[in-house]
């Protein structure tokens, strides 16, 4: 159901997106605030697919690796992790010169490998990224997530603590953990739930309100692009 006062704006956004146009920053802000009830999973995937296509096109036009990184982040959010992998592996080594860029590529590629289920490869990319930019929280959150998915809960929690020390918010870390739980099988679900409640029953009280989600999709992005 669409509220009358939202109808015109929502239809305008949908028409432009359907016509292959990018949404403006104001459009996205509206969809994430006042219009959040209409920003469904399917709608979000269409938005990220459009953004991925734009940045991939910009990469082909400019050869700027940052466009490939941005495109890959959006590909992850519309279940196209393989497209992201292919794009990232196409970046010539000679264009990966600055440490910050190389870390961003490694972190993004690690997230892609995580989406595809190649956790050891994701771990390697995260380790590379952390070595390149040890003060950046993003490689730390990636390593935290991957270690949790590998069953290394203490190690994963240590990496999340390092991420928090470097600026990651408690909310973003908890969103990461929530996503991991929702993608876990029953056995791992129970293990992670028990670990978190044992570690800090107050902070992780929200775990008790979640219910196992049986379906998982290779190539589907997690809620947070680590």
Language-model segments: what does each one mean?
Residues 50, 83, 121, 155, ...:
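Alpha-helical positions within canonical tetratricopeptide repeat
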Residues 62, 88, 94-96, 133, ...:
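Alpha-helical junction/boundary sensor with strong preference for TPR arrays
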Residues 4-39, 60-77, 100-111, 174-176:
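Amphipathic alpha-helical repeat scaffolds of TPR domains
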Residues 51-62, 91-100:
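Flexible helix-coil transition and linker loops at the boundaries of alpha-helical arrays
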């Amino acid at each position: 159901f669409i509220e009358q006062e939202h109808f015109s704006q929502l239809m305008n956004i949908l028409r432009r997106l359907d016509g292959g146009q990018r949404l403006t920053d104001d459009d996205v802000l509206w969809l994430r605030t006042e219009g959040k009830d209409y920003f469904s999973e399917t709608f979000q995937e269409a938005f990220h697919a459009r953004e991925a296509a734009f940045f991939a096109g910009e990469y082909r036009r400019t050869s700027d690796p940052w466009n490939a990184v941005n495109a890959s982040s959006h590909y992850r959010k519309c279940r196209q992790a393989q497209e992201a992998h292919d794009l990232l592996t196409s970046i010539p080594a000679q264009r990966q010169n600055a440490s910050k860029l190389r870390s961003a590529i490694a972190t993004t590629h690690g997230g892609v490998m995580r989406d595809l289920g190649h956790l050891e490869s994701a771990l390697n990319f995260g380790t590379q990224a952390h070595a390149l930019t040890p003060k950046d929280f993003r490689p730390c959150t990636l390593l935290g997530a991957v270690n949790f998915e590998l069953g290394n809960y203490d190690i994963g929690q240590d990496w999340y603590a390092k991420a928090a020390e470097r600026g990651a918010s408690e909310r973003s870390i908890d969103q990461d953990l929530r996503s991991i739980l929702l993608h876990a099988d029953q056995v791992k679900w129970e293990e992670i739930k028990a670990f978190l409640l044992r570690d800090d029953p107050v902070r992780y009280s929200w775990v008790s309100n979640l219910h196992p989600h049986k379906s998982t999709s290779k190539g589907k992005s997690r809620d947070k692009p680590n």
